[in-house]
């Protein structure tokens, strides 16, 4: 499959994942989003899969933690450009954990849904705990 189509699938499925949370609460989209990520992780070469996972994460986190722009801009006094830059930087950091998921899935050629779940839970635990964590979203 063309890598640009894979990138598009990853980005769109990442953005769709945001709609599983409040205020939208379309909880079924969480499954669609994760299935898009797993599809990318299993059907792509390592470099393509890692970049696609980065795009998935940026779509998921940039839109999901967009509320931080209000905090940084209105209450922190930073310019809007700085606010968007900081949220993008945070999203890029948070992308490391789904990228670790993709790396582990490819490294160990995971085929079992249970092992997918274990690896995902492990990387989410790290995201919520490591360096004081960021468990939201």
PLM-predicted stretches and their roles:
Residues 1-137:
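Membrane-embedded alpha-helical bundles of multi-pass enzymes
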